[in-house]
Amino acid sequence: MTKITKTLFAASLLLISYVLFRLVDYSKVMLGHPLSNIYHDIHGYTPQLFFLKVCGFHQSCPYWYNGIKTFIATPPAWYFFAYPFYIITNNLFIAFYITAILIFLFSFLAIYYIGKIKLKSRLQRLAFFAFVFGNNVTMLTLRMDRLPELFAWFFLIISFFIILHYKDREIAWPFYLLAPMYALTILSYHGVGILLSFIFLGLFLVKLIENKTEAIKVALTGILGFGLTAFWSIPLLLEARNLFISQTSLGAEAWWDFAGNYLHFTPIAIIILPLGFFIIFYLYLKTNEKTNDLIFIAPSFLLIVLFMSGLIKFIPIIKTIFSNIFFIFIIILISYYLLNIKFGKLNTNFAKLASVLIIVLTIGTIAISMYNTPLYDTATPEQRNVAELLNYVDEKFIIAGGLREIKSNHHAIYAYAPIYNNLTTAGGQYPALKDFQYLEDLDALHGNFSVSCEVFSSFSDKLNVKQYIAYGKNCDWLSYCGAKLDKTIGKACLYSK
C-alpha cells in the first residue's frame, strides 16, 4: 500500500465518520419545527410539502401571502420524493429526516456502483464520496436543511459519471438516461441544473470536434431533458416577470463583497477553491495522456474563472446561483481529477507533500465545519412562547416588528402556523412567490416600526391583516398605536387591529 493510498484511506475514514456524526445530530429535526433563525431553510420546505398535501400541485393555496399558487417558483422533485414518506408517517419532520438519510445513502451507492466506470478502485470511490459529502460546505448545506439541493447533487453526480463514460467512447442507448437525469437535476434545484449544463456543454464540444453526428445526439438529449421539465418550467417562465424571483439580487458573491472582512470563509473559498482546481487539473493533465480533456473542461473552466474573478455577478441567470453551490461544484471536479492523478509519475517528494496536504485539508475542513456550523438546535422557551400564541389567533395575522431578540424571525412562525394551527397569514417564507410591491408593503409591517401608526394601519388594511404577534418592546408600540391586547405569554403578545 503506497503512502498516497494510506492517506486517502485515512482521509476517507475521517470524513465519513464526520458525515455520520452530523447525520445523527441532524436527527433532532424529527423533534419538530425549529423556531430559530440560525441556519434554517426548513421554514420554506416543510410548509410547501404540507401545501402539496392539502392544496395540490400548481393550485391556489390560502396559507401564505393572502394566497399563492403552489410550486410556481419551487422546483418540485424533492417534494414528490418526500411526499410518500409524509403520507406513510403522517409527520413532516420524520419524512424530512428519512429523505436526508436516503439522499446520502443513494449518493453513496451511485458513486460506488456507477462511479466505478471512471473510478476503478473501491478506495477511489470511497474517497470521492468522502470528499464531496464530508466537506464543510456540504455539511453546512445539510445543517441549513437544503435537502432539495442535496437531492440535485445526487442526480448531477450520476449524470457526471455517465457523461465522463461517453466522452471517450461511442454513444450507446444508456447515454439517453441523461435526459431524465438532467430533468431531475433541474426539477430538484435549478441552480445545480444550470451547472450540470456546463458539463453537458463540454461533452457537446468534444463530440462536435470528433463526431458531429454524436454531437447532435448530445444536443438532442439535452433538449429532451429540458423538455421533460416543461410541466414546471414553462409556467415558471410565464409567471416569472410577476414574481420577486425576477427582481432579486441574491446569488453568487464576489470577493469584494466582503471588504473589511476578507478572513470570512466565503471570500477565502472564492479564491482558494478555484486555485486548487487549476493546480489539480494541471497535475491530472501532466500524468494522463488524453487529448480531449481540455476541450471537455473548457466551459466549466471558464465558469470557474468568472466565479473567481467576481464577473459572474454580471451574467444573467448564472449570477443567481449561490456561492456555496459553486463551491460544491468545484469540489466535485477537484475530487474527480485528484483521484485520477497518477502520483507514480510525479516526483516522490511531491507525492509525499500531497499526502500531507490531503490530511491537513481533511482535518481543516472538519475543524472549520465544527467551528462555523453549529449543531442542530431546538426551540427555546422564549421561541415556544411566540409559537404558543398561535393557539389564540383566529384572523389573518403577521409578525410585527421582528423577533431578533429571541434569535427567531417571522419566517419561522409563518412556517409553523399552517402546519400546526392551520392558520393563514399575509406573510410567508418564500418571497419568490409574490411580486416586489407586495413584499415591500409587507416589509413595512415587519420592520422596526419606522413608519407612523397611520401608515402601519393603512398597510395592514391593504394586506388584510387583522392580528399581530410581537415580542418585547414591539408590544408597547402596538399598544401605543391603539391595537387591542388579546393575549400575552411571557414577553410575547398578541394584538388585534
Task: Mark where each language-model region is.
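Start-transfer (signal-anchor) and selected internal transmembrane alpha helices
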Residues: M1-K28, N349-I358
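Membrane-interfacial loop-to-transmembrane alpha-helix junctions, especially the N-terminal start
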Residues: L8, L123-L126, I171-P174, E214-A219, ...
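Active-site lumenal/periplasmic loops and adjacent helix-entry segments of GT-C-fold
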Residues: Y18-I157, L184-T185, H190-I194, T373-A379, ...
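Membrane-helix boundary/interfacial segments in multi-pass membrane proteins
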Residues: M30-G44, N66-T70, V137-F151, N242-P267, ...
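Transmembrane catalytic cores of multi-pass membrane glycosyltransferases
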Residues: D41, C55, L147, T185-L285, ...
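Extracytoplasmic
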Residues: L109, I171, S246, K290, ...
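Membrane-interface transmembrane helices that cradle and orient dolichyl/undecaprenyl
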Residues: I157-P174
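Signature aromatic-anchored transmembrane alpha helix within multi-pass, membrane-resident enzymes
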Residues: A219-F226, L339-A367
